[in-house]
Design a protein with these regions (language model features):
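One-carbon transfer enzymes
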Residues: 1-206
């Protein structure tokens, strides 16, 4: 049975696009039923429309009184969601949603967490720090989402080597390729029921 997926995105949604392409190639036993975005002008919405995926705009302008994201939770519950994927989503997920969908929300982060994680570390800002500190390695992390920024259990990480000649933009491009690779891998693991939990401990079934 196909897994029901909802994607959250705020920008270009390249990871969203990558997952869609893998589904089209029958490499994922899943279906994306909804795109949630806080940004009505983001490119991810254009891609959702092309692929006949419903889009839901959720932000403080539309719902100024929904401080706990209860309206959003009600919307999600209509889709019998198996998995929520954050793909460059720039807003914090509420406690009500992270608790209801515990161990069912994944995020991709452009660093080797816990390094360069937390509030304020996202996108090019991460790569600028890596470049400024002259790090010779970086990478990407797929983790489960909890109530805080970038602190949930880590599912997958992949490291890459960096040279002194690579600036923040070059690092970003290199890391994005890794993001696409390991996010697909993580979603595949979930769809194939290889992820299990025992008393809060993450177990991977071979």
């Amino acid at each position: 049975m196909k897994k029901s997926i909802v994607v959250f995105a705020s920008g270009t949604g390249s990871n969203f696009k990558n997952i869609i392409e893998k589904i089209k190639l029958h490499r994922l036993n899943a279906q994306i039923n909804l795109l949630v975005s806080n940004n009505s002008n983001c490119k991810a919405i254009d891609f959702a429309k092309i692929n006949n995926i419903e889009t839901y705009i959720y932000n403080s302008k539309r719902y100024p009184n929904d401080l706990n994201q209860d309206v959003l939770l009600q919307k999600l519950n209509r889709y019998k969601v198996d998995l929520i994927l954050l793909a460059g989503y720039m807003k914090k997920i509420s406690k009500s949603i992270t608790r209801f969908y515990k161990y069912k929300i994944l995020n991709i982060h452009p660093s080797l967490l816990p390094k360069y994680g937390g509030k304020g570390f996202y996108g090019i800002k991460v790569h600028e720090e890596v470049y400024k500190n002259q790090d010779r390695k970086s990478g990407a992390t797929v983790h489960f989402v909890d109530e805080n920024y970038d602190t949930g259990p880590i599912l997958l990480q992949k490291e890459i080597s960096l040279s002194s000649s690579e600036d923040s933009l070059a690092i970003a491009k290199k890391v994005l390729d890794i993001e696409h690779e390991i996010y697909f891998q993580a979603v595949s693991m979930f769809c194939n029921d290889k992820i299990h939990w025992n008393k809060g401990k993450l177990l991977i079934k071979e």
